[in-house]
Regions:
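Non-ligating segments of multi-cofactor redox enzymes
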Residues: 1-257
Length: 257
């Protein structure tokens, strides 16, 4: 019996974590042909990272293609693309080795674009600078605000970037720029990103692209000519690949000009 791809990717992850950080290349591939538009990934991510109402790390965009009577509804989940040339980092005013956002080169998160909530000044320049709309400023709202008591599930801390962040009052990350980070706090503990684990249709692949034995590397190799990235013309070199669409430009209305 063939292994569930989650089992395979879990084994790949355990192997990847034993490799030197500089030899790993975390990547994600999303096969939109399998997406049922259930948004389980969106909700699981919001729960994992304690996101405010209406603000998402991984929205699922939907569009219609074709003409009546041959119409088709297609979907595109959009996490942060973890660009190798991230425009958001370039426009951040808090620079330097102890800056607010950067392209990580060391440790578990090597290759990811993280945010240091303690250094972020909430200016929003990175939000405007991301052409994919993958960042937002935490608006400080709660789902149960206006009720007699905020529910505990909203005020317990998240564990992004390996630290505890109690999202209460004006505590960080309220007011900070926020974004997807491939759930590096989970990866550091040997778990796959929450969006990958929660996908009931198994449309997401994650792992070390540099490991030829990993499932994601093999899927990328087998489908190389068919793979697409969002706004390739920008030269940002995203680490999130899409399979199953022939033209991603139909989703451009969701992106910044």
């Amino acid at each position: 019996m063939e292994k569930d791809i989650l089992v395979r990717m879990q084994e790949d992850l355990e192997r990847a974590l034993k490799r030197p950080a500089e030899k790993r290349r975390w990547a994600m591939l999303l096969d939109t042909r399998k997406c049922t538009k259930c948004t389980a990934c969106t909700i699981a991510c919001a729960s994992e990272n304690k996101l405010p109402p209406g603000q998402w790390y991984r929205p699922v965009w939907e569009e219609e293609i074709g003409t009546y009577p041959k119409l088709q509804r297609v979907a595109l989940p959009r996490p942060c693309l973890q660009c190798d040339k991230p425009p958001c980092v370039e426009v951040c005013p808090v620079k330097g080795p102890d800056g607010a956002t950067w392209k990580e080169t060391k440790g578990i998160g090597a290759g990811i674009v993280p945010i240091n909530y303690a250094k972020c000044i909430g200016c929003g320049k990175c939000v405007s600078g991301c052409p994919y709309g993958a960042r937002f400023l935490d608006n400080g709202r709660f789902y149960t605000e206006g009720t007699p008591q905020l529910q505990k599930y909203e005020t317990v801390p998240s564990f992004e970037y390996g630290k505890e962040w109690p999202r209460q009052g004006k505590n960080q990350p309220v007011g900070n720029a926020r974004k997807c980070h491939f759930c590096m706090h989970r990866i550091a503990n040997g778990m796959l990103p929450q969006c990958i684990s929660s996908c009931v249709c198994r449309m997401g692949y994650f792992g070390d692209e540099n490991d030829p034995d990993s499932l994601i590397a093999q899927v990328i190799k087998a489908n190389k000519p068919k793979l697409l990235v969002l706004k390739k013309n920008l030269g940002t070199l995203p680490r999130v690949y899409y399979l199953g669409q022939t033209d991603l430009s139909i989703f451009n209305k969701h992106l910044k000009a």
